[in-house]
């Protein structure tokens, strides 16, 4: 990914937005699992969130666009984690400006997605986004919480 160029930055942001749409689809899966599960369930519990993980991880890895893929999801108590990988870029090639744009772009998209709000954020489940380069080396990680979405 040519993230040192403006077109690369734009492609990365388009990929991020597409990734948010994948996250929204996962939110619908969370709602389905929540409705079909037992009557009283702590939806923030690691046990419940890991049931969601087990249901959706067979869908991955999945290309978000030519530059980005979602590799898997994971969970811990009160936190649902999305793992993304930039498939064509090494950590040394990443423009710091692109990384700086990640959090606000993903936050806006997540907070605007009703499925994400209703199935995660309003249930006080933190969303964690973890990004790595083509070799799996860490690039960025951040959380989105109720406070970020103002709910």
Model-inferred region functions:
Residues 33, 59, 63, 109, ...:
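Solvent-exposed amphipathic alpha-helical surface segments
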Residues 34-77:
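N-proximal, solvent-exposed amphipathic alpha-helical segments enriched in charged/polar residues
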Residues 11-31:
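Hydrophobic membrane-insertion alpha-helices, especially the h-region
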Residues 92-118:
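Short, non-transmembrane amphipathic alpha-helical segments
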Residues 1-8:
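N-terminal Lys/Arg-rich, disordered targeting/topogenic segments
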Residues 42-45, 49, 82, 92-100, ...:
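Solvent-exposed, acidic/flexible segments
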Residues 67-71, 76-81, 85-93, 117-151:
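Polar/charged, Gly/Pro-rich intrinsically disordered segments
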């Amino acid at each position: 990914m040519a993230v040192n160029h403006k077109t690369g930055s734009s492609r990365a942001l388009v990929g991020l937005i597409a990734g948010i749409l994948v996250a929204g689809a996962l939110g619908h899966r969370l709602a389905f699992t929540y409705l079909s599960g037992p009557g009283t369930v702590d939806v923030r519990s690691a046990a419940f969130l890991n049931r969601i993980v087990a249901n959706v991880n067979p869908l991955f890895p999945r290309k978000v666009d030519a530059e980005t893929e979602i590799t898997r999801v994971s969970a811990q108590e009160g936190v649902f984690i999305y793992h993304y990988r930039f498939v064509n870029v090494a950590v040394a090639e990443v423009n710091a400006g692109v990384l700086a744009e990640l959090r606000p772009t993903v936050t806006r998209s997540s907070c605007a997605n009703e499925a994400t709000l209703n199935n995660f954020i309003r249930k006080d489940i933190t969303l964690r986004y973890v990004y790595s380069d083509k070799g799996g080396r860490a690039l960025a990680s951040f959380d989105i919480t109720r406070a970020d979405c103002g709910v």
